[in-house]
Amino acid sequence: MSKPPFTHLHVHTQYSLLDGAARLKDMFDACNEMGMSHIAMSDHGNLHGAYDFFHSAKKAGVTPIIGIEAYVAPESRRNKRKIQWGQPHQKRDDVSGSGGYTHKTMWATNSKGLHNLFRLSSDAYAEGWLQKWPRMDKETISQWSEGIVASTGCPSGEVQTRLRLGHFDEALKAAADYQDIFGKDRYFLELMDHGIEIEHRVRDGLLEIGRKLGIPPLVTNDSHYTYAHEATAHDALLCIQTGKNLSDPDRFRFDGTGYYLKSTDEMYAIDSSDAWQEGCANTRLIAEMIDTTGMFEKRDLMPKFDIPEGFTEITWFQEEVRRGMERRFPGGVPEDRQKQAEYEMDVIIQMGFPGYFLVVADFIMWAKNQGIAVGPGRGSAAGSIVAYAMGITDLDPIPHGLIFERFLNPERVSMPDVDIDFDERRRVEVIRYVTEKYGADKVAMIGTYGKIKAKNAIKDSARVLGYPYAMGDRLTKAMPADVLGKGIDLNGITDPTHPRYSEAGEIRSMYESEPDVKKVIDTAKGVEGLVRQMGVHAAGVIMSSEPIVDHAPIWVRHTDGVTITQWDYPQCESLGLLKMDFLGLRNLTIMDDAVKMVKSNKGIDLDLLSLPLDDPTTFELLQRGDTLGVFQFDGGPMRSLLRLMKPDNFEDISAVSALYRPGPMGMDSHTNYALRKNGLQEITPIHKELEEPLQEVLAVTYGLIVYQEQVQKAAQIIAGYSLGEADILRRVMGKKKPDELAKNFVLFQAGARKNGYSDEAIQALWDVLVPFAGYAFNKAHSAAYGLVSYWTGYLKANYPAEYMAALLTSVKDDKDKSAVYLNECRRMGIKVLPPNVNESMSNFAAQGDDVILFGLSAVRNVGTNVVESIIKCRKAKGKYASFPDYLDKVEAVVCNKRTTESLIKAGAFDEMGHTRKGLTAQYEPMIDNVVAVKRKEAEGQFDLFGGMGDEQSDEPGFGLDVVFGEDEWDKTYLLAQEREMLGLYVSDHPLFGLEHVLSDKADAGISQLTGGDFGDGAVVTIGGIISGLQRKMTKQGNAWAIATVEDLAGSLECMFFPATYQLVSTQLVEDAVVFVKGRLDKREDVPRLVAMELMIPDLSNAGTNAPVVLTIPATRITPPMVSRLGEILTHHRGDSEVRIKLQGPTKTTVLRLDRHRVKPDPALFGDLKVLLGPSCLAG
């Protein structure tokens, strides 16, 4: 008689993080190969994989069984202690987290059971967390047991653990308790056999309990991978989890064998006993209980907005739009805007989304009312006039040619997706608001799956195999570079059919010729793509009208109590849960700070939304490419494009951000646009028949397809598509599937023929639209973000000190970016001063038109409380007249030696006339004295002055009447100390005066290397000062070093590997000015230079007769200007050479004025700044 087919019920997928290595596709393929109709998942303590498992199984034709191998607290889940199960000598028999939990396997038989598993898993994270285990207990299991079938679990189950410890009666009671909870026919004795002693030792006891209580046996295989040959990869995965090497004899490993998906015959053949045979057959009983009806069904879970009495959701939505239109157009709503608003409202109501708009508009309005900066729009939502009316966006879509159907398409119903930018510092306040408004159980952050990518798989595998770090590092560097952030997978190395196979020649050669490399990569293939950890979406929030745990499980991050879904956002969205993106945009923070600073510094109230979009000063800045620090326009190549394009209207700003992307740039669209705009390239129509009908669509982009909206409009005008149908066509074109394109071309051609166009014209248009549809950009997004670019450009052009101060504050924790923007301030003629206890605020602050003060909070070792106290005491008691006066006035919390030393070295007391060296020699005993007095004063023993000093003196006593030395440290030491405290050279720079020396031999500034000007592998020479040096040894005993080389605008790590180091080691000295030639390595997040040569420049005459370098945009060169410049240079005759950096649209040319020699003094510099502007001397 044939045996019933076996069903695997104890299966750990890759979602048993770093413990399960079973990939879902492999599992279901194996089931189909072995004729198994059902399979369960039972991951450790979570349901992260439930959605993926369910739908992947259904797709493969296998019935999914959703289960969990739960952690069960031995007492209450709220009790955060471990218990001692047995005597010390029985420790080996306690395999239950050292008394922290036991295991239990449970499976959902129907939709009710599935949702009860959601509840159990979620509560385990929320209330049962202990160290790293989310634990349920008998109370919660009893409460949510309906629809669930369970077993005694693996050898770590409570019943088995008590049996191993010799506690039969306790084991019997535990089994009886669970039988009562689940029911007589829904609780089983779980039998396993992997050839290990702890499984066999309790078998008789388990079966005895079964006989006494009538509990049937159930055989499982503790599967952790799909195929037997994957045991080695799984072993490596365990080592990745524990941080051990495979060769470590004491590492965690699985005892026994056979942890894969065995066939029915293999499972029955393990043991011929009746109990085992019955247990195998009983797996079919559970399979037959499974009813997946209603599982993972999509529902309408839109959060419910509170509607005022007398309105329905629809009528209140219409009323809000009406009021919003009146606010936006106080002089009367134009007819075209009103008509569009009515059309959009009809579509939104028809699609069932009025509640969505009300919810979004509400929290945006709340944020604005709280003074939280909100972006003007993002993505396709900016194409909706309803969104504009309701305050969701701040850009009128009609003048910019934006299309509503790009946002909501009545031809293709899908959830609207509005992403909102907030001031990054206050984004959490908005999330808190919606959490409180809709309920903490109805709002959660969104989980993400962190997978083991190819390069990490290589590094991890090299480590667990015992190879040195250099092995993994060498292999990852030989991998092809990422393309658009996506790396090649490891199969691409050896699979000739892989699209990137040809790029992997270097690592393939190593794989084929070096056995150790082959071993590493083969091991890496076994773990690549597995889920390593759960993370949290940077911006995504799930909102629901019902408790989220009724529809999806959650987990809790116990460092801050944040609730997070166990699934990612596409999975959550497919169930009807609303996903919103609450994004933090640093530039909103910068603009908010700058606007407030303009008010405090100049008394001007700026309203960004009211700014004219044709400010000449702003467009002059853009045309010069002076956009370092301007949103989206910060990079070197982008600045070059701006100089070439010469934008003079807002449409250009929108276009440049759309064009500056790999697709359009690969087709030279950015250059063609710039040339056509400036009359340097003829504007040719796509076809003469199409010139007039497409004139309105293409005129703004000089005949080029730049935007997705243009593709839609062209299909509407030429082929008669509705804008909704055209959006679907655009998506088809973007995917470039030949069969779909062919089918759609027939429809497109028919529509165009009907409108009277020739086949030649139709084909010409199609041939242009198809490639560009994939590259064209969403104009709604580029226009909305273009507005932010314009605002930041406006602030930099019109309020440079305030804007740059806000910009420096935003990057104060990134010293490389701080150096770039500090140098930009110098170029702009803005003086950045060291911190000053009498003037500085917490952050960078503008003073007047051309001074920025360093913020006190940017000083190392100076905490927020200290800064607040310094400012508070200064406001209450007046400025500090001297260092003793400072110690007298500030609170005791400020009188900290480490803090005070940092402030001294940073220059915060320079204004008082004390030298830093003099203060450093005296501050410690002074603090000792004043702290003792302040302590007694706080205890009420006496007043600080208390008659102890001269009654007529304004100076405090108690050892504070000190004479300070007037000597100062030498410049090198002083600047080194300043840099240590501020992370930057501020008051001066060791390289000032040496710019001409560096520019003579350096190929580029360091900021150009760390930006996008140079690609990976480029051989370049940089110049600067060695500001940090680490000497190291390889495992083979060879010396090498990492030198940090810094110039005026950035720093870069230079790797001197042994061969090079041996030649230059004596020249590698901190504070030395050097040139380094090397190969740029940009494969990691932070670029580095692999040094090939080191050169020491001759600085003996560097400070004398240094050339005067003038930076002049080519557009400024006019005969009157040249004439006046000659007069100035002649008037200030001297011995220094004059050079001009002539900034053209794509490159800068350096000219030497051999006829002129000048005296570089303030008088010359003043005349030059009047003629050429304050930034002409900044190089």
Curated annotation (Swiss-Prot):
Region ranges (Disordered): 77-99
Keywords: Cytoplasm, DNA replication, DNA-directed DNA polymerase, Nucleotidyltransferase, Transferase
Primary role: DNA polymerase III is a complex, multichain enzyme responsible for most of the replicative synthesis in bacteria. This DNA polymerase also exhibits 3' to 5' exonuclease activity. The alpha chain is the DNA polymerase.
Protein name, per record: DNA polymerase III subunit alpha
GO cellular component: cytoplasm
Source organism per UniProt: Streptomyces coelicolor (strain ATCC BAA-471 / A3(2) / M145)
EC class of the enzyme, as a word: transferase
CDD domains per record: DnaE_OBF (cd04485), PHP_PolIIIA_DnaE3 (cd12113)
